[in-house]
């Protein structure tokens, strides 16, 4: 009987498809990482060989996916408890944990070594540090130990523009640090809004998110605080001259709207009103970051096209 059960388990694990492995890469998170990395690469001064640019973005994507896989390997116990994650490949019994670990480590090594050999070792070092920071510092330490987990751990998601910039220029500049800071400051209000309407899930998994440790009021206050700091930082690319007036105007409007949504969440009276405001802030935060970086990308592409064709 035990032998048959073991055979059934092995059969279930062997039926993992390419789609199941794709889920391990956290494709939705990866898409935002790849996009911000691409923006950093394109906005950086100069022109990069298209093939090397494609290799750089591929390595950022693979590295981001590797981080996601390592996160799912370590967090399998948490994922099994939370409603939104219990159907992931490990808790669902589709892929064995050791296979996920091997998959994540292989992708990590491939992305870092390929980026170093084909592009430059500065960008590879930044990618390696990003993977380490997310998989070890955030996932294995911060996430389960402090309500400031996503404040410090948010650095991992903020590195891709710096990686793209370093791939294109071989340097880390203050301009690339500004792109890092935009995402770094965006992360707390984004995830705290999520944690407010997912508090029960996090509590069941014993993850010390801000609402469960410090309370909803403190979470709302800190989300507003970070939003107020983030809004002017989002305008800095225009102030520093590596973005144009269109970006300056749009980033100002988006920043003011972000602060407004955070303020609405702060002043919400009833529980239903607060939860509705948290969902609106969460959704708008995605629009804010993608919109900001999309305008940066379009402006940079237009400017470089004008220069290339002698129109500027």
From Swiss-Prot:
Its EC number is 2.5.1.141. The chain crosses the membrane at residues 29-49, 50-70, 90-110, 117-137, 150-170, 177-197, 223-243, 248-268, 292-312. Pfam families: UbiA. The keyword Cytoplasm does not apply. It comes from the Bacteria. Carbon 2 of the heme B porphyrin ring is defined according to the Fischer nomenclature. This is Protoheme IX farnesyltransferase. It comes from Brucella anthropi (strain ATCC 49188 / DSM 6882 / CCUG 24695 / JCM 21032 / LMG 3331 / NBRC 15819 / NCTC 12168 / Alc 37) (Ochrobactrum anthropi). The gene is ctaB.
